Amino acid sequence: MNSFKSMSLKEKMIYLLTLVYLLPFFIFIAANMLFSMFQTTYMDLYLDTEKPLYKSDHPILLIALVLFLIAGLTYCFKKKEITTEICSAFEKFSLIWAAFISLFIIFLFRVRVACDSAYLSDIAIDFLNGDYSSLTGNGYLVHYPHQLGMIALLEVIYAVFGIENYTVLQFLNVIAIVSTIYYLHRISDEMFHKPQIQILLSLLCIGLLPLYLYTTFIYGDIPSLGLIVPAVYYIVRYLNTQKKIYSIPAIVLMTLSMELKSNSSIILVAAIIILILHMICHKDKFVVLFLLLLIGTPYITNTAVNTCYAHAAKLDHIPSGIPKAAWIAMGLQSNDYIENGWYNSYNWDIYTENNFDTSATTAACIDSIKQSVREFASHPKTCLKFFYKKFISQWNDPGYQAQITIEWYSRHRDDQSDLALYFIYGNGRLILEAIMNFYHFTILLGSSIFAFCSLRKHELANTLLSLCVFGGYFFHLFWEAGGRYGLCYFVLCLPMAAWGFWKLTSRQ
């Protein structure tokens, strides 16, 4: 992008509109980085609820390690000329490593399903047996019908490979993780065209332990991530080339990702905003059709899935489920026992209390939201403390709840190996925690540098990742909190972090 003075009126308008999300993105990511320097969020063992705890960090040590890392990278880049072959070798190694470490984690921990994963698995088995009772009465899917997409996937896997074949589902997670790493490289190459950045990204991908530890997690998170990252790539590719062919995989991948995890709609909203800005800037009329399909295809697909299940269950329609307002109401509620805005069963309870009436539940939730807003307005310090605690509880956990998830799932096995127990309960757990803590700070630092530099100069397509991550930060200020929910956005930070460290290790 040209300097502001030399821009046309239209370019100036687009630049100012992008600052609407680039500036708050920088504030969020920089605050996250500073908080991570001084404090770490973690979860203790043997708990039955998700309860974030906090401990002081070691800022001097973190800074010293980062300076050592920068010095080492600077020396290596000066010493060795970076070629296409070297970039390719690093990328291939990062992909092989991702597959290897993910498979190693599967066979090391050998965990089964628990919590919501167990509910979905049991429902998929019931559906295969012709039992659709979870769609009636006080059933799980009466409350959470948005899980039907994931249940459909479980049904297919169980029908083909056998009931409760968790290993196949975990292998699908491995494929999704490798897809994520591969397309992060494609996004970086499309955005930056710098071989040094590609190598830095490969190195950062090798350290992506929070993602690899989720390989055993049977839920929509990892499969949807393996679809949404390539969707982002094809949207960036379209923005840079205006080749219509790239809209097709973007639409298909976005649709499948949203069917497995409804929160992928945050990425969809970011894509819609970027495409509208692109249309204004380049007078690209095809974007209108692109947007219609990008919005309409997920809706049509979801309707088709719901219709199929309604027909199978002999229902007129699938229950509408808990209204979205319930998650916002819950996300704005104080909670001294767990943490502000975390799950407290409010959404389930209020829907049940109102006899599964969506309108009545929505009205009750809006009253709760108004009450929270009045409390915040009357007590500004309480408001600030509320959102600070909510923010650090979910965004300052270096493992994004990966370790506590493995610990919960491991409780369903009595034959864990000594090595598995070492990493779940022993000193190995602390080692993983320390590695992820440094890695977390490193990614946030690099991303903060990228965010700061983007305020002055940026290409529109290169701001899509920033908008996606900002969307995650903003959405979960008000929505139900949870460390696991931030993993997707943390992964999307990697190309930006690689650019940030390229800036620190080069004189350009």
Locate the predicted segments by residue.
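Short acidic/glycine- and proline-prone juxtamembrane loop motifs at membrane-interface regions
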Residues: 210-224
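Start-transfer (signal-anchor) and selected internal transmembrane alpha helices
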Residues: 1-104, 287-295, 508
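Membrane-proximal stem/loop segments at transmembrane-domain junctions that anchor or position
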Residues: 309-412
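Extracytoplasmic catalytic/substrate-binding loops of multi-pass membrane glycan-assembly enzymes
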Residues: 109-125, 129-157, 163-164, 361-365, ...
